[in-house]
Protein backbone atom coordinates (compact mmCIF):
# COMPACT_ATOMS: atom_id res chain seq x y z
CA UNK A 1 0.00 0.00 0.00
CA UNK A 2 2.78 2.48 0.86
CA UNK A 3 5.10 0.75 -1.65
CA UNK A 4 8.19 2.23 0.02
CA UNK A 5 11.71 0.91 0.31
CA UNK A 6 11.54 1.91 3.96
CA UNK A 7 8.88 3.29 6.28
CA UNK A 8 10.05 5.10 9.41
CA UNK A 9 8.42 6.00 12.69
CA UNK A 10 10.33 8.63 14.67
CA UNK A 11 10.11 7.94 18.41
CA UNK A 12 12.06 9.05 21.47
CA UNK A 13 12.92 5.77 23.24
CA UNK A 14 11.48 6.97 26.56
CA UNK A 15 8.12 7.84 24.93
CA UNK A 16 6.68 4.33 25.07
CA UNK A 17 3.20 5.84 25.47
CA UNK A 18 3.44 7.40 22.02
CA UNK A 19 4.92 4.25 20.51
CA UNK A 20 2.05 2.15 21.87
CA UNK A 21 -0.58 4.49 20.39
CA UNK A 22 1.23 4.63 17.04
CA UNK A 23 1.39 0.83 16.92
CA UNK A 24 -2.37 0.69 17.52
CA UNK A 25 -2.87 3.12 14.61
CA UNK A 26 -0.85 1.00 12.18
CA UNK A 27 -2.45 -2.25 13.37
CA UNK A 28 -5.93 -0.80 12.88
CA UNK A 29 -5.01 0.33 9.35
CA UNK A 30 -3.54 -3.08 8.51
CA UNK A 31 -0.10 -1.63 7.85
CA UNK A 32 3.13 -3.30 8.95
CA UNK A 33 4.73 -1.45 11.82
CA UNK A 34 7.34 0.98 10.43
CA UNK A 35 10.99 0.77 11.39
CA UNK A 36 11.47 2.68 14.63
CA UNK A 37 13.94 5.50 14.15
CA UNK A 38 15.23 6.51 17.59
CA UNK A 39 14.58 10.23 17.66
CA UNK A 40 17.50 12.51 18.38
CA UNK A 41 17.16 13.73 21.95
CA UNK A 42 18.83 17.14 21.76
CA UNK A 43 18.65 17.41 25.55
CA UNK A 44 21.44 14.82 25.62
CA UNK A 45 23.62 16.63 23.11
CA UNK A 46 26.17 19.21 24.13
CA UNK A 47 25.04 22.12 22.01
CA UNK A 48 26.84 25.40 22.48
CA UNK A 49 24.73 28.52 22.51
CA UNK A 50 21.48 26.58 22.37
CA UNK A 51 18.63 27.86 24.43
CA UNK A 52 16.86 25.05 26.26
CA UNK A 53 13.57 25.89 24.54
CA UNK A 54 15.11 24.99 21.16
CA UNK A 55 16.26 21.48 22.08
CA UNK A 56 13.05 19.75 20.97
CA UNK A 57 13.06 21.68 17.70
CA UNK A 58 16.67 20.65 17.06
CA UNK A 59 16.05 17.01 17.95
CA UNK A 60 13.03 16.81 15.64
CA UNK A 61 14.90 18.51 12.80
CA UNK A 62 17.93 16.22 13.15
CA UNK A 63 15.75 13.10 13.29
CA UNK A 64 14.20 13.89 9.90
CA UNK A 65 17.58 14.95 8.51
CA UNK A 66 19.28 11.69 9.52
CA UNK A 67 16.44 9.64 8.02
CA UNK A 68 17.01 11.41 4.69
CA UNK A 69 20.74 10.78 5.04
CA UNK A 70 20.13 7.06 5.71
CA UNK A 71 17.81 6.86 2.69
CA UNK A 72 20.49 8.38 0.45
CA UNK A 73 23.24 6.14 1.81
CA UNK A 74 21.10 3.05 1.23
CA UNK A 75 19.88 4.11 -2.20
CA UNK A 76 16.21 4.06 -1.24
CA UNK A 77 13.91 5.27 -4.00
CA UNK A 78 10.86 5.97 -1.82
CA UNK A 79 10.43 6.40 1.92
CA UNK A 80 7.55 7.22 4.23
CA UNK A 81 8.12 9.10 7.48
CA UNK A 82 5.71 9.22 10.41
CA UNK A 83 6.13 10.93 13.75
CA UNK A 84 4.96 8.99 16.79
CA UNK A 85 2.02 11.29 17.47
CA UNK A 86 0.40 10.43 14.15
CA UNK A 87 -3.26 9.46 13.96
CA UNK A 88 -4.36 7.62 10.82
CA UNK A 89 -7.85 8.29 9.48
CA UNK A 90 -10.35 5.45 9.84
CA UNK A 91 -10.25 4.90 6.09
CA UNK A 92 -6.49 5.48 5.73
CA UNK A 93 -5.72 2.48 3.50
CA UNK A 94 -8.56 3.06 1.04
CA UNK A 95 -7.91 6.81 0.84
CA UNK A 96 -4.17 6.29 0.33
CA UNK A 97 -4.78 3.82 -2.50
CA UNK A 98 -7.23 6.25 -4.10
CA UNK A 99 -4.82 9.18 -3.78
CA UNK A 100 -1.82 7.26 -5.12
CA UNK A 101 -3.79 6.57 -8.30
CA UNK A 102 -4.34 10.33 -8.72
CA UNK A 103 -0.99 11.86 -7.78
CA UNK A 104 1.06 12.92 -10.84
CA UNK A 105 3.85 10.48 -11.73
CA UNK A 106 6.62 13.06 -11.22
CA UNK A 107 5.81 13.66 -7.55
CA UNK A 108 8.79 14.05 -5.23
CA UNK A 109 7.06 14.72 -1.90
CA UNK A 110 3.56 13.78 -0.81
CA UNK A 111 2.03 15.05 2.42
CA UNK A 112 -0.35 12.55 4.00
CA UNK A 113 -0.89 14.85 6.98
CA UNK A 114 -0.45 18.61 7.25
CA UNK A 115 -1.86 21.90 8.45
CA UNK A 116 -2.84 24.56 5.96
CA UNK A 117 -1.95 28.08 7.01
CA UNK A 118 -4.16 30.87 5.81
CA UNK A 119 -3.15 33.32 3.15
CA UNK A 120 -2.56 31.29 0.01
CA UNK A 121 -5.08 29.18 -1.85
CA UNK A 122 -4.16 25.60 -2.63
CA UNK A 123 -4.33 24.33 -6.20
CA UNK A 124 -6.61 21.35 -6.82
CA UNK A 125 -4.94 18.77 -9.10
CA UNK A 126 -7.54 16.01 -8.83
CA UNK A 127 -10.33 14.96 -6.51
CA UNK A 128 -7.89 13.94 -3.74
CA UNK A 129 -4.66 15.77 -4.61
CA UNK A 130 -3.68 19.42 -4.13
CA UNK A 131 -0.50 21.44 -4.53
CA UNK A 132 0.48 22.96 -1.18
CA UNK A 133 0.92 26.70 -0.96
CA UNK A 134 1.26 27.33 2.76
CA UNK A 135 1.53 24.01 4.56
CA UNK A 136 3.10 22.89 7.83
CA UNK A 137 3.57 19.45 9.33
CA UNK A 138 6.00 16.55 9.17
CA UNK A 139 3.89 14.00 11.02
CA UNK A 140 3.20 11.97 7.84
CA UNK A 141 4.81 12.29 4.42
CA UNK A 142 6.45 10.34 1.62
CA UNK A 143 9.40 11.42 -0.46
CA UNK A 144 10.87 9.70 -3.48
CA UNK A 145 13.65 9.67 -6.04
CA UNK A 146 15.64 12.91 -6.31
CA UNK A 147 13.24 14.51 -3.83
CA UNK A 148 15.17 12.74 -1.07
CA UNK A 149 18.42 14.43 -2.13
CA UNK A 150 16.76 17.82 -2.66
CA UNK A 151 15.37 17.71 0.87
CA UNK A 152 18.67 16.54 2.35
CA UNK A 153 20.70 19.18 0.51
CA UNK A 154 18.33 21.96 1.59
CA UNK A 155 18.32 20.98 5.27
CA UNK A 156 22.02 21.54 5.94
CA UNK A 157 21.32 24.44 8.30
CA UNK A 158 18.71 24.61 11.04
CA UNK A 159 16.90 27.93 10.71
CA UNK A 160 13.48 27.06 12.04
CA UNK A 161 11.13 24.17 12.80
CA UNK A 162 11.66 21.54 10.12
CA UNK A 163 8.11 21.77 8.77
CA UNK A 164 8.42 25.54 8.33
CA UNK A 165 11.79 25.19 6.65
CA UNK A 166 10.45 22.50 4.29
CA UNK A 167 7.42 24.63 3.44
CA UNK A 168 9.42 27.78 2.78
CA UNK A 169 12.68 26.46 1.30
CA UNK A 170 11.96 23.07 -0.25
CA UNK A 171 8.34 22.77 -1.36
CA UNK A 172 8.79 25.50 -4.02
CA UNK A 173 11.74 23.54 -5.50
CA UNK A 174 9.99 20.17 -5.80
CA UNK A 175 6.93 18.48 -7.23
CA UNK A 176 5.08 18.44 -3.92
CA UNK A 177 1.48 17.40 -3.37
CA UNK A 178 -0.98 16.87 -0.52
CA UNK A 179 -3.61 14.21 -0.11
CA UNK A 180 -6.73 16.30 0.38
CA UNK A 181 -8.38 16.09 2.73
CA UNK A 182 -5.52 14.83 4.88
CA UNK A 183 -5.48 11.16 5.92
CA UNK A 184 -3.13 11.63 8.89
CA UNK A 185 -3.42 13.95 11.87
CA UNK A 186 -1.50 14.73 15.05
CA UNK A 187 -2.77 13.54 18.39
CA UNK A 188 -3.03 15.78 21.39
CA UNK A 189 -0.36 13.83 23.27
CA UNK A 190 2.08 16.08 25.13
CA UNK A 191 4.87 17.07 22.78
CA UNK A 192 8.58 16.99 23.55
CA UNK A 193 9.06 20.00 21.26
CA UNK A 194 8.51 23.20 23.20
Predicted regions and their residues:
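An acidic/histidine-cluster motif and surrounding catalytic segment
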Residues: 1-82, 86-194
Amino acid sequence: MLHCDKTYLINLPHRTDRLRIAKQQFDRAGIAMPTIFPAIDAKRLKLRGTVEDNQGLIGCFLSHYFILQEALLNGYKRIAVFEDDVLLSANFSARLTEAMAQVPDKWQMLYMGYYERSGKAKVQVSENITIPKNTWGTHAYMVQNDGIKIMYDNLQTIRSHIDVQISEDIVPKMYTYCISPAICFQSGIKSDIK
